[in-house]
Amino acid sequence: AMQPAEYVEFLVERIANVVAQAWAARKPASAGWGLGHAVLAINRRSVYADGTAQMYGPTDAANFRGFEGGEDHGVEVLCFWDADGKLIATSINVACPAQEVEGLWQIDADLWHPVREALRAKHGNDLVVLAWTGAAGDQSPHLMYNKRAEERMRELRKLTRLEELSRRIVAGWDEAHEGATQERHGDVEFKHTVETIDLPLRVVTDEEYANANAK
């Protein structure tokens, strides 16, 4: 099997070639952006009355008090049109990892595959759909709360879980696209900026250290 270092070399070469080809083939176009919403991920760390937290911890326990952090339901969208006004590409950013399907010996796009299929059915098979996973630390698409209600509604819609998640993304994309298409810009500045941000470290208490060593 290909090792990580080998795959990086394999991938970087191909990405570089695609970028060079795209740059050489660039043509006049316009861009627009918009914001929609979709409930996709939830914080996966349950918090209990004694102050402890557990990853994927049960939420039906009597001492369950909430989740360790919040979630971001924004669907940030970029759209690109050619000189004739045809939608040729879109990028979609959601704060949710593509990991609804796990533990299988296969490589797939998870929830993004049905998203691409749905958008291409509306806007043409040659539409490029670029998926971005935003800031999604401790976020998960796995159901943590209202499980029975969520599953009931999904079954009534006769959808798989992947189809349900993609349905929400596409609905959010439609909201964003409706706004983006009204403000198309042909003179957008193209630049690359990198910033290094210093974040404070979380200090482990003596009690937490002792508990961790005791396990």
Predicted segments, located by residue:
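Non-catalytic substrate/cofactor recognition surfaces at enzyme active-site rims
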Residues: 1-215
